[in-house]
C-alpha cells in the first residue's frame, strides 16, 4: 500500500471520504490540492470497470489497478482531439463543464507525485505507462513534452511488422521497469498495429500489524462446491476492525498497511458474490467505513501473489469508450501523419500479499483484557479484495479472488 511519511496528519471526514482532508508539509496535501477533484470520478470509474471485467470472466480471478488505468487513459487523451478526446474523458467519468482538461491532467500529475512521495523503504512498488508507436511515425514534440510533464511516461518506436520482435521489446521494457517483477506482458502482436498503450503496477506493502509466519498453515480453500485447493493460510489475532453487514450479504475486515494503505477483505455469503459486487460503490465504501466495529478477531487470510493481465479494448468498448479503437479516431495531437487508431490497451497488476510487517518498529496487536471470545473471520472461499490510498481515496486495487493458486 502507498505509504505516508511519519510527519503526516490526517483528518477523515465522516460525511464524505472522497473529500478527505490531509496535511503533509512534504507532499503539500491540502483540501484544495488538484487530485481531490479527481477522487469521486476515479472511484466511480473503478467500480464500473471492475464490474464489467468480472462479468466477462465468470468463475475467474480478477485483479486490476483502476487508478493506474485511469491515469493511462487520461495520458492518452493528451494526444486525442475532437470527439475521440471528449468520449475518452467522459468515459473516465469527468464532467468537462465542471472540470477542465488542464485541471484533470494537473490532478493526475499531483496524484502521481503524491504516490512517489508516500513511497519509502517499507514499500515496494513500480507503476507506469508507456506508448509504443509505429517506428515510421513522427511524433509531435508537444505531445512528448506533455506526457513527460504530467505522467512521466515515454513514447517509444516499435517495428510492429516484426510482431515477435515488438513483443520482446515491450516485455523487456516492462521487465526492466519493474525489476523483473512483471514479465511476459504481451505475446506476438498483430503486424497491423500502430499504437499500443501499456500500463503496469507491482505492489508489495508492509502491514501495520504483520502476520506471524510461524502461524501460517496449509489449509483448504473452497473454490466452489466441487473444487478444493490447499493454500498457505496466514493467521493473526487481536483488535481488528470488522463488520457483519446488515444491508448486503457479506462480512468484512479492514486492515492497514504502514502509512496510507487501507485494505478491505470482503467475504460474501455463499452464492452471493454477484450481489455484493453489484452493490460496490462510493456509498457502500462510505457506509462500511462508518459502520466498522473494533473488536477481538481471529483472522485467517490466504498468502498469495495475485495478478491480472488484460487487453482492455473490449471492456472499454462495452463501457462506451470505443472511438479510440476506430479507424475514424482522431489522434492528431500525437502525429499529423497517417490516421492513427489504438490497437491495444494492455494492463497488468501484481500484488504480493504475505505476512510481512516492519518487524523492529511495529507493535503487536493488543488483546483487550476481559474481552469476550474472539470472533473468527476465515477467508477460505472466494472473496473480494480492495486496497485504497486513504490520503486520496484512490482505488489502487480491486480484486476478486476465486482461487488463490
Swiss-Prot record:
It holds the Pfam family Serpin. Cortisol binds at residues 254, 286, 393. SUPFAM superfamilies: Serpins (SSF56574). GO terms for cellular component: extracellular space. GO terms for molecular function: serine-type endopeptidase inhibitor activity; steroid binding. Its main location: secreted. It is found in: Secreted. Keywords: Glycoprotein, Lipid-binding, Secreted, Signal, Steroid-binding, Transport. Residues 1-22 form the signal peptide. It comes from the Eukaryota. The record marks 250 as: Conserved cysteine within steroid binding domain. Glycans are attached at residues 95, 224, 260. Major transport protein for glucocorticoids and progestins in the blood of almost all vertebrate species. Belongs to the serpin family. Proteolytic cleavage leads to an important conformation change. This reduces the affinity for steroids. This is Corticosteroid-binding globulin. It comes from Ursus arctos. The gene is Serpina6.
Amino acid at each position: 500500500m502507498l505509504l505516508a511519511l511519519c510527519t503526516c496528519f490526517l483528518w477523515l471526514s465522516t460525511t464524505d471520504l472522497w473529500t478527505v482532508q490531509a496535511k503533509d508539509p512534504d507532499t503539500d496535501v491540502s483540501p484544495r490540492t488538484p487530485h481531490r477533484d479527481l477522487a469521486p470520478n476515479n472511484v466511480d470509474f473503478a467500480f464500473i470497470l471492475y464490474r464489467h471485467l468480472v462479468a466477462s470472466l465468470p468463475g475467474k480471478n480478477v485483479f486490476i489497478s483502476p487508478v493506474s488505468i485511469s491515469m493511462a487513459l487520461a495520458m492518452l487523451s493528451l494526444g486525442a482531439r475532437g470527439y475521440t478526446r471528449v468520449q475518452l474523458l467522459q468515459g473516465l467519468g469527468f464532467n468537462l463543464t465542471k472540470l477542465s482538461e488542464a485541471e484533470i491532467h494537473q490532478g493526475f500529475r499531483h496524484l502521481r507525485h503524491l504516490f512517489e512521495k508516500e513511497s519509502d523503504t517499507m514499500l515496494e512498488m513500480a507503476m507506469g505507462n508507456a506508448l509504443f508507436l509505429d517506428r515510421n511515425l513522427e511524433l509531435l514534440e508537444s505531445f512528448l513534452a506533455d506526457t513527460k510533464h504530467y505522467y512521466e511516461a515515454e513514447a517509444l518506436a516499435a517495428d510492429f511488422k516484426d510482431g515477435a520482435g515488438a513483443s520482446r521489446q515491450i516485455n523487456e521494457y516492462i521487465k526492466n521497469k519493474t525489476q523483473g517483477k512483471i514479465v511476459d506482458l504481451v505475446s506476438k502482436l498483430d503486424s497491423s498495429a500502430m499504437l499500443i498503450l501499456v500500463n503496469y503496477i507491482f505492489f508489495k506493502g508492509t502491514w501495520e500489524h504483520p502476520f506471524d509466519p510461524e502461524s501460517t498453515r496449509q489449509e483448504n480453500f473452497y473454490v466452489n462446491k466441487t473444487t478444493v485447493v490447499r493454500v498457505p493460510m496466514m493467521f493473526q489475532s487481536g483488535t481488528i476492525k470488522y463488520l457483519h453487514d446488515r444491508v448486503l450479504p457479506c462480512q468484512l475486515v479492514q486492515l492497514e498497511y504502514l502509512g496510507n494503505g487501507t485494505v478491505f477483505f470482503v467475504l460474501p455469503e455463499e452464492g452471493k458474490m454477484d450481489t455484493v459486487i453489484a452493490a460496490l460503490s462510493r456509498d457502500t465504501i462510505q457506509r462500511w467505513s462508518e459502520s466498522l466495529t473494533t473488536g477481538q478477531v481471529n483472522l485467517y487470510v490466504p498468502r498469495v501473489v495475485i495478478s491480472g493481465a488484460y487487453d482492455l479494448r473490449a471492456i472499454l468498448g462495452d463501457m462506451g469508450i470505443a472511438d479510440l479503437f476506430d479507424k475514424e479516431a482522431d489522434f492528431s495531437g500525437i502525429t499529423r501523419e497517417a490516421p492513427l487508431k489504438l490497437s491495444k490497451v494492455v494492463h497488468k497488476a501484481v500484488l504480493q500479499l504475505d505476512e510481512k510487517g516492519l518487524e523492529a518498529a511495529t507493535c503487536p496487536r493488543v488483546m483487550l483484557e476481559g474481552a469476550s471470545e474472539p470472533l473468527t473471520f476465515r477467508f477460505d472461499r472466494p472473496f473480494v479484495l480492495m486496497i485504497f490510498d486513504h490520503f486520496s481515496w484512490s482505488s489502487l486495487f480491486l480484486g476478486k479472488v476465486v482461487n488463490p493458486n
